[in-house]
């Protein structure tokens, strides 16, 4: 794997956020279409209408996960920009990598997102975390901070979904 710079990684993160925005927009449009179909078919085809409602719920969950992923990428972007100034890589990025892995697992095997997120995670691990593990100073609980980051991303995602996408969770 080619060693990449933080600037290149930041560019990848920004592109991933843009793609996530596109997918959220597509999912929103699909959600609106399914809601219209559900309402128009409720009298004639109640079973079909129920299936549309179920798919609407699945699409909403997908949007929630995408917004959380976008927020985690924004946090990663901020941390990488801060890292340029600060310098201690392992302590700063390990919890975010763990949180991205967990959220990627929730998202499933997406053809569109998995390769992008895998590449970002792999770059962070091989280029920034692995070479610096020997000089890791303070011991931190990576899993706990990852859970905290996921909780923070979930809270921000709920707020953003309510304000921008009119989705209540």
Swiss-Prot record:
A GO biological process this protein is involved in? cell division
- Secretion signal span: none
Keyword annotations of the record: Cell cycle, Cell division
Instruction: Explain the consequences of disrupting this gene.
Output: Deletion mutant forms extremely small colonies on selective plates. Forms enlarged cells, with a highly elevated content of DNA. Mutant shows aberrant cellular localization of CdvA.
User: Which regions span the lipid bilayer?
Assistant: none
Indicate yes or no for the key word Cell cycle.
Answer: yes
Disulphide connectivity of cysteines: none
Q: Which domain of life is it from?
A: Archaea
| Primary role | Part of a cell division machinery. May fulfill a coordination function between the Cdv proteins during cell division.
Which protein is depicted? Cell division protein B3
Q: Which organism is it from?
A: Sulfolobus acidocaldarius (strain ATCC 33909 / DSM 639 / JCM 8929 / NBRC 15157 / NCIMB 11770)
Q: Could you tell me the gene encoding this protein?
A: cdvB3
């Amino acid at each position: 794997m080619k060693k990449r710079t933080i600037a290149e990684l930041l560019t990848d993160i920004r592109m991933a956020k843009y793609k996530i925005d596109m997918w959220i927009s597509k999912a929103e449009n699909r959600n609106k279409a399914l809601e219209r179909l559900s309402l128009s078919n409720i009298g004639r085809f109640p079973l079909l209408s129920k299936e549309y409602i179920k798919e609407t719920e699945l699409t909403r969950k997908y949007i929630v996960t995408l917004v959380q992923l976008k927020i985690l990428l924004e946090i990663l972007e901020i941390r990488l920009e801060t890292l340029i100034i600060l310098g201690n890589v392992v302590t700063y990025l390990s919890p975010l990598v763990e949180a991205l892995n967990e959220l990627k697992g929730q998202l499933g095997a997406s053809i569109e997102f998995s390769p992008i997120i895998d590449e970002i995670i792999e770059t962070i691990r091989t280029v920034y975390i692995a070479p610096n593990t020997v000089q890791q100073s303070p011991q931190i609980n990576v899993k706990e901070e990852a859970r905290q980051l996921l909780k923070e991303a979930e809270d921000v995602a709920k707020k953003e979904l309510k304000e921008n996408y009119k989705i209540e969770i």
